[in-house]
Amino acid sequence: MSNKDELYTFGIGENFHLQNYLGVHSENGSFCFRVWAPNAENVQVIGDFTDWRNRPLQMNKNQAGVWEANSLDAREGDLYKYLVTRKGGQVVEKIDPMAVYMERRPGTASVIKVLRNKKWEDGLWMGRRKRLGFQKRPINIYEVHAGSWKKDDFGHPMTFSQLKDYLIPYLVEMNYTHVEFMPLMAHPLDMSWGYQLMGYFAFEHTYGTPEEFQDFVEACHKNNIGVLVDWVPGHFIQNDDALAYFDGTATYEYQNHDRAHNYRWGALNFDLGKNQVQSFLISSALFWIEHYHIDGIRVDAVSNMLYLDYDEGPWEANQFGDNRNLEGYHFLRKLNKVIKERHPNVMMIAEESTASTPITKDLESGGLGFDFKWNMGWMNDILRFYEEDPLYRQYDFNLVTFSFMYIFNENFVLAFSHDEVVHGKKSMMHKMWGDRYNQFAGLRNLYAYQMCHPGKKLLFMGSEFGQFLEWKYNDQLEWENLNDDMNQKMQRYTKQLNQFYKDHKCLWRIDDSFDGLEIIDADNKSETVLSFIRKDDKGDLLLCVFNMTPVERPNFTIGVPQAGIYEEVLNTEMEEFGGVWKNHNPVTKTQVATWKDYDHTLSFTLPALGASVWRIKRRLRK
């Protein structure tokens, strides 16, 4: 586009590759700097090439509020900032909102960097992604904080060139299908875990270079691993050298003070109704999709973007007298529309905790157009249940079964995320009831239930081997736990469970309707046993039975819809996983008997605090 067209589309909220115009660009042997600061009294470029404030480079402003200057002295790798004279006369140093790289902390300067035009070698993956999509594919996500998965020999966070050598083989070995990273965009404080951003196009220096991350993604794709990233378009860090009140007025944030300030997180909220902000944010999302070949974006804190009263501070109703943030609603629909028009097989996932807005319904039906949303209700209910003494679980059995009332209202991801293993909530293993043996048994049971329940899957790092302590953002995982036999067996169990999930289409082929689910018994409160069948579109099925008390149940009998010879294909109490069973249940033939609405029954021993999953080895005539 011409500069005139760039400015016009930016102003109407339709410039979706804003980084091609704003920011710093190599042009005819010089570097051109452009920044949007419509109400600034003056803007200058300062940096290594101006001896910082000693020889500032004056910028000129156009009618759209964009300031521009060219430098013959600037070189790639130089540090720079904008010296902004705000409306009112205050002079502040600001980052470049469009910078693609920033200096190593504690510095906050932007870096002049020309991104390489990578010749990608992941064509097989990208072609398969386009051909097969993802809705009817297995999705089992390993959630990672790149700075604390594993430290290098000097105790520093690994860069992505190092993670390529260590994390990718681990993902492959553990049979995950995708890896999701907590924010990789530039952020000044590790304590925020990356969720208070300052650079929406800048790769976080701590983790290496943009080129290293490109190579990491390519290597993941070559190993059949998809890559997702977290992205935070609702709020941003309020540091004075970042986006906050960039030109002295509400530039990126709302003009209304209470709407601008996020009291819960000590951040500032984007003005999602402002056209220029829409161009900025949608350009950021597309940049990560296109430049890094990522396979999906998880949008953080969607509820904060949808509801005016979600925050802890004062709020005002909209023009209709209710609590909906109409600008947020329309922005999210626009975001998903733009991305799906260009990249229909990139996953858009919402972290959203309410049930009043249709998150994954299509745009034509009035939904927001996301592909998936995290099932926060299921997660809260199920963790509360598994923490409870089994003696009382029969009275709270609805915590396990309630999800079947709404499971297909949205397309869900069943997430045990980082949020559940911090701030005194305890690690996944430590949440479980009982002594050490029963804690591991409960965790195996829980993970089997997650895998068999409709919905895509996500597990935070460290939870796969039963790390005992909570996650600490400034330390690596407790890999030393794997010196313990029980943790080793827990890791082996998760690895085999992940492969079990991939191998059985019944668990992922139909995740969005009762065509893939048949409830056998959700009323057995007295024994606290839940049973259901998962089905695929070819007629195959798995019978899934969960004993949620530490009482073994010999000759447990259940109705089944298909006569046949059944084989146990998963038993969470096997000795190799840390249990006490040396052998599986024997292959078992159904009996002709009436059980509820079924004409055939299957009898077997149900392990204490265990899950037992069966497949039909041979069908018999009814």
Swiss-Prot record:
Family annotation (InterPro entries): A-amylase/branching_C, Branching_enzy, GlgB, GlgB_N_E_set_prok, Glyco_hydro_13_cat_dom, Glyco_hydro_13_N, Glyco_hydro_b, Glycoside_hydrolase_SF
Catalysed reactions, as listed in the record: Transfers a segment of a (1->4)-alpha-D-glucan chain to a primary hydroxy group in a similar glucan chain
UniProt KW Transferase keyword: yes
Gene3D superfamilies named in the record: Glycosidases, Golgi alpha-mannosidase II, Immunoglobulins
GO biological process: glycogen biosynthetic process
Pathway(s) per entry: Glycan biosynthesis; glycogen biosynthesis
GO MF entries: 1,4-alpha-glucan branching enzyme activity; cation binding; hydrolase activity, hydrolyzing O-glycosyl compounds
Keywords: Carbohydrate metabolism, Glycogen biosynthesis, Glycogen metabolism, Glycosyltransferase, Transferase
EC number: 2.4.1.18
Annotated coiled-coil segments of the chain: none
Family: Belongs to the glycosyl hydrolase 13 family. GlgB subfamily.
Protein name stated in the entry: 1,4-alpha-glucan branching enzyme GlgB
Source species: Streptococcus agalactiae serotype V (strain ATCC BAA-611 / 2603 V/R)
Lineage: Bacteria, Bacillati, Bacillota, Bacilli, Lactobacillales
